[in-house]
Every structure is written in C-alpha cells, then in structure tokens.
Regions:
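Cytosolic regulatory modules rich in charged/polar residues
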Residues: 1-102
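Residue-level signature of catalytic and energy-coupling elements of molecular machines
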Residues: 27, 70, 115, 203, ...
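Non-transmembrane, extramembrane segments of multi-pass ion/lipid transporters
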Residues: 33-66, 117-140, 195-201
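Hydrophobic side chains within alpha-helical segments
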Residues: 36, 72, 120, 219-220
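Hydrophobic alpha-helical scaffolding
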Residues: 56, 72, 112, 182-183
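Hydrophobic alpha-helical transmembrane segments of multi-pass small-molecule transporters/permeases
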Residues: 69, 89, 103-109, 175-180
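Generic detector of multi-pass transmembrane helix bundles and their immediately adjacent loops
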Residues: 78, 84, 89-93, 97, ...
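Hydrophobic, small-residue-rich transmembrane alpha-helices and their short perimembrane loops
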Residues: 86, 100-117
Length: 234
C-alpha cells in the first residue's frame, strides 16, 4: 500500500491499474482508496519526528501514551547528562573565561535547528523515493554549500554582536568559529543520518526528532569547548 501511495504521489496520479500474474487488468486503485494510507503514513512519521515510538491515539490509556513517549525522553535525559559531563571536562576553561558559559544555549540551539532542517528535507525526499535522483555526491555537495553560506552569515552576525556587547575579541572569535563549525557538522549529520537509517531499513523519520537534536547538542558542545580551549591556549 505504501509503495502504491509513493508512486501516486511522485507521478501525481489519480489512479493506478491493477493486473494479475498474466498481465490482465483486474481493477484499479484510485486516490480515494489510497488517501487513508497516505494519511496514516504522514501521521506515523509526524509521531516519530516528535519522539513517539509507537502509533497512539489521544483516547488511548495513560500508560500506553506514557510508554510511547518515555523512550526518547529518557534518551534526551541521557544526552543532557552527557552534555553535563562534556561541560565538566572543560570546567577549568569556563572558570577562567566565564563568558563561554553564556553562549552554550546558542551553540546547542543552532546545532539542533540546523540538524532538524537538514534531516527533514532528506526524510521528505526519501518519502517519495527521489533522495538519490541526482546522486549522493551532488546532494552532499549542495548541503555543504548551503551550510557554508548559512554558517558564514551566522558567524559574521554573532561575531559582530558579541564584540559589540562584550567588547571581547577573543570571545567573539571563539563563538563565531565554533558556530561556523557546528553549522557545517550539524548539516552533514542531519543529511547523512536519515540516509544511513533508511539503508538499514529503519524509518528515517527517527532522525528528524530527538535523536538528531540530542546528537547535535553533544556535538555542538564538544566543538565549542574544543575551539575555545585551542584559541585561548595559543
């Protein structure tokens, strides 16, 4: 059913013929027949992107709703604990340069948002089976160019803002360089992760929710503090 729905969506068809093993026409599938499949598929992907691992309805029991939501909430909590560990590793740097702590939310939020944007586009492409239409190399190159442009714009803006507000050139360079690196890495992860999941037969919509957000939060923190440690030790 899902394969038929994808074909009808891709080619904008109103009906698809049905033939038997001998190639004889035995009927047809219309858009009215397939609309429920499309709706169900969209709902399933929306729930996965929200971190709900099983198909649930609002009139289900409290325990059923809780079981569907808890797994990714627990994973998010574990991610938060790991983020605390990463921060603790660089606590000495934070004590010396207190301003570093002020930009942790900015780095984490930007990485998460960029990753979700990239993964959502890939998941949408995979849904209609055209993610590889132009070849994986061309897609990754386009992602890289977009990330370079967005990273450059955001880095210039944040550099000017930090310099204007805090009058600290070293801090401005640190935040700007880290933000640029985070945008590049988050874009790459957001693009590659759904493709890898799809290749292993796992619904790629998983990569558009808490998974990619948590992963990019950790990645962003590690990059940010590594850049800060490197620049301030020079």
């Amino acid at each position: 059913d899902k394969e038929v729905a994808q074909i009808m969506q891709k080619y904008d068809l109103e009906a698809v013929p049905v033939v038997n093993a001998r190639g004889k026409l035995v009927g047809r599938i219309t858009i009215d027949d397939i609309i429920d499949v499309i709706t169900e598929q969209a709902e399933e992907e929306r729930q996965l992107m929200s971190g709900i691992v099983t198909d649930v309805e609002e009139d289900d029991s409290v325990w059923t709703l809780s079981k569907a939501r808890l797994p990714w909430l627990i994973i998010g909590m574990v991610g938060g604990l790991l983020a605390a560990q990463i921060t603790d590793l660089f606590s000495a740097d934070i004590k010396i340069i207190a301003g570093l702590a002020l930009f942790i939310p900015l780095i984490m939020a930007t990485g998460g948002n960029v990753g979700i944007q990239s993964s959502s586009i890939v998941v949408q492409s995979l849904a209609v089976k055209n993610a590889f239409a132009d070849g994986i190399g061309k897609r990754l190159m386009k992602v890289l160019v977009v990330a370079l442009v967005n990273g450059a714009v955001l880095s210039v803006l944040v550099f000017g803002s930090v310099l204007l507000i805090f009058q600290d050139q070293s801090l401005s360079y640190t935040v700007a360089i880290a933000l640029f690196a985070v945008v590049l890495l988050a874009s790459f992860m957001g693009t590659v992760t759904p493709l890898v999941l799809d290749n292993f037969g796992i619904n790629p919509a998983l990569a558009s929710g808490p998974f990619i957000t948590t992963a990019n939060d950790l990645l962003g923190l590690a990059v940010y503090f590594s850049v800060a440690h490197l620049l301030y030790s020079l």
